């Protein structure tokens, strides 16, 4: 079977980009799929031109072109991201971290118990808003790094922006839905544990996972390491 030339492969990358596929990882998958199909067509029809074979392969994607593939891939990577969060969160809770969680819960409970219900609500608000400010600054920094990169990666975009920002925007909602009066010590204890657990979850999502993003990308895409040297 005649293999496509490097120039033709680059044409396929340009073709996918022109059809609204901007992530290099997805472009590579589509280019590989298109190239295989085109090579088969050219073998079966030697007189067929490259562009004609390309259009024939593209028609197989239907009226919406690559968009359905893009959406399916995004859904799959979102599921992968949720699995990554779970694994990081699970790995985070070693014995020392469990002890730290208990200590932080007791500390928060003791602090809240020293104040009236209205002040308790204010303390929780300050706690969340402080974390929100720090995390938001970090996400802006990561987003700036993404924009400077030559290639966009869908998983990287999800890792560093979409899911992180989604988690942050849940904080104000969580704050607004909190009860103003917390009189039960049992409920106060549960709320202290819940808030500590939520903050640890956000810490893992905003700080731990982004710091390991390159390792995750290299494991997912072997070509990622190669593109860093280009």
Which residues fall in each region the model found?
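C-terminal alpha-helix/helix-terminus motif
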Residues: 8, 61, 65-68, 217, ...
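Alpha-helical protein-protein interaction elements
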Residues: 7, 50-53, 58, 73, ...
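Bimodal feature
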Residues: 18, 29, 43, 77, ...
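N-terminal, intrinsically disordered, low-complexity segments
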Residues: 1-64
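Cytosolic juxtamembrane regions of integral membrane proteins
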Residues: 48-107
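Hydrophobic alpha-helical bundles in membrane proteins
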Residues: 86-230
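Intrinsically disordered, low-complexity regions enriched in small/polar residues
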Residues: 30, 52, 63, 83, ...
């Amino acid at each position: 079977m005649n293999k496509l030339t490097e120039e033709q492969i680059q044409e396929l990358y340009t073709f996918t980009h022109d059809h609204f596929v901007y992530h290099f990882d997805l472009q590579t998958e589509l280019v590989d799929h298109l190239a295989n199909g085109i090579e088969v067509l050219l073998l079966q029809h030697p007189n067929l031109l490259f562009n004609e074979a390309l259009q024939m392969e593209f028609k197989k994607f239907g009226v919406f072109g690559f968009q359905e593939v893009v959406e399916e891939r995004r859904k799959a990577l979102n599921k992968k991201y949720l699995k990554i969060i779970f694994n990081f969160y699970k790995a985070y809770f070693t014995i020392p971290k469990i002890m730290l969680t208990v200590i932080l819960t007791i500390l928060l409970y003791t602090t809240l118990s020293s104040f009236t219900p209205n002040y308790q609500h204010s303390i929780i608000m300050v706690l969340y808003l402080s974390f929100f400010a720090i995390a938001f600054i970090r996400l802006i920094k990561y987003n700036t790094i993404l924009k400077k990169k030559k290639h966009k990666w869908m998983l990287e975009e999800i890792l560093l922006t979409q899911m992180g920002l989604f988690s942050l925007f849940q904080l104000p909602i969580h704050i607004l839905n909190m009860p103003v009066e917390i009189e039960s010590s049992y409920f106060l204890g549960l709320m202290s544990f819940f808030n500590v657990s939520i903050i640890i979850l956000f810490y893992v999502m905003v700080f731990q996972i982004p710091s390991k993003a390159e390792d995750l990308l290299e494991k997912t895409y072997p070509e990622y390491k190669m593109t860093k040297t280009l």
